[in-house]
Amino acid sequence: MRLLDSVTKEKIKLDKKDISIYLCGPTVYDDAHLGHARSSVCFDLLRRVLLAQGNRVKFARNYTDIDDKILKKMAQSGQTLEEITEFYIKSYEEDMRVLNVLDPDFKPRATHYITAMLDLIKKLAKDGFVYTLEDGIYFDTSKDEKYLSLSNRNLEENISRLSNEVQKRNESDFVLWKFDENFYESEFGKGRPGWHTECVAMIDSIFENTLDIHAGGIDLLFPHHENEAAQCRCGCKRKLANIWLHNGFVKIDGEKMSKSLNNSFFIKDALKEFMGEALRFYLLSSHYRSHFNYSLSDLENAKKRLDKFYRLKKRLDLGEISDFDVLNDIGIKSEIAKQILEILNDDLNVSKALALLDDFISSANLELDKESKNKILKQNIKEALSELAKIFGFGFMDATLYFQWGVSKEEREEIEKLILERTEAKKNKDFNTADAIREQLNSKKITLLDTPNGTIWEKINA
């Protein structure tokens, strides 16, 4: 596999069997938005590709569960920090399950690594990288000769991005430990960790050695990842990661989506209108490094492309597909899956891979038209679809249920009741009643399909 490193702007070959990946996760003070979804889905694809070709992947995605935004939420809601963070961690993980994001091997929470963070600050203090101001302990960026080497910024660009709320030695200096009487005891004074320190301590505790891949949104490159790299370089005496990967922004009407801009589109909002697999397909449809402009029409088109996958599944009477065990490779056998893996090995060229998937579905349908009773052909296509589902992370549902998505239990019962009435009417040659029931359901966007095994129904989405 070759991946474009955000730092060197060059494709770096990843040819190890054991791969370590750390993905910066959410700050858990609100429901997750599409920006969080895109980052998780893009790097879940990376993980799936590696697992599918037999790599052993050690994957961590953190939770920032102590932060100024969470404290603000506490003040507004009257809830405890634990009540807020537990609620939104659960909410986030529900969203990830619906999007078919594989559960990480490690899900570290910042509050569980306070001792490790203090140990890191002690190391930095011992080597002269820190100083104290009235509100906390700061990292002196002028002591790090390689500071800004990650984001490749110059000092003027750096200064323009930072505020000067306290009298720091350098505009680019950042807080390691914020004094706060409501939190943790330490030799520096009661307080809580700075955001940039949290990730370094968690990475060091879990992985111990230089990461193969550090991933996150492009908005984290500076200052977050720059400051992480500085602390690891100066405190842990090593490079933090060999490859840095950053996914592009999700935009709404051409503007970056963020909670601070009050233009967030929550995952849960999208899932009210579209199933998780359709949203996943949509978020994967552009290259991870490109900026992604949210469009309802594009999401609808992505759903139509996914429909073709399920039409083929339905034609083959292929039911639910089980996702693969992350502890074992899935033993890719089909030629199409091997071809798609080869494409994705080139910096996750997903557009080309999805185009090949479209071609495969079209070709498979043509072959089935010619040889509808060929059992070997059908079995080969079924195996290919199962492998492709595990690589892309969509296509797992039973096809019949897929085309019935979005219908409530009560509506489902009413539909089934009307189908029985229609079946009885047809037996009695009461075709006017049978046609009237069909029209009644059609007006509710339900279409009926009469098959040798009985009548089935689907929801009309367009």
From Swiss-Prot:
It catalyses: tRNA(Cys) + L-cysteine + ATP = L-cysteinyl-tRNA(Cys) + AMP + diphosphate. ATP binds at K259. GO terms for biological process: cysteinyl-tRNA aminoacylation. Signal peptide: none annotated. HAMAP family: Cys_tRNA_synth (MF_00041). Zn(2+) binds at C24, C199, H224, E228. InterPro entries: Cys-tRNA-ligase, Cys-tRNA-synt_Ia_DALR, Cys-tRNA/MSH_ligase, Rossmann-like_a/b/a_fold, tRNA-synt_1_cat_dom, tRNAsynth_Ia_anticodon-bd. Its main location: cytoplasm. Belongs to the class-I aminoacyl-tRNA synthetase family. It is found in: Cytoplasm. Its EC number is 6.1.1.16. A motif ('HIGH' region) lies at residues 26-36. It is an enzyme of class 6 (ligase). GO terms for cellular component: cytosol. GO terms for molecular function: ATP binding; cysteine-tRNA ligase activity; zinc ion binding. Keywords: Aminoacyl-tRNA synthetase, ATP-binding, Cytoplasm, Ligase, Metal-binding, Nucleotide-binding, Protein biosynthesis, Zinc. This is Cysteine--tRNA ligase. It comes from Campylobacter jejuni subsp. jejuni serotype O:2 (strain ATCC 700819 / NCTC 11168). A motif ('KMSKS' region) lies at residues 256-260. Its cofactor is Zn(2+). Binds 1 zinc ion per subunit. Monomer.
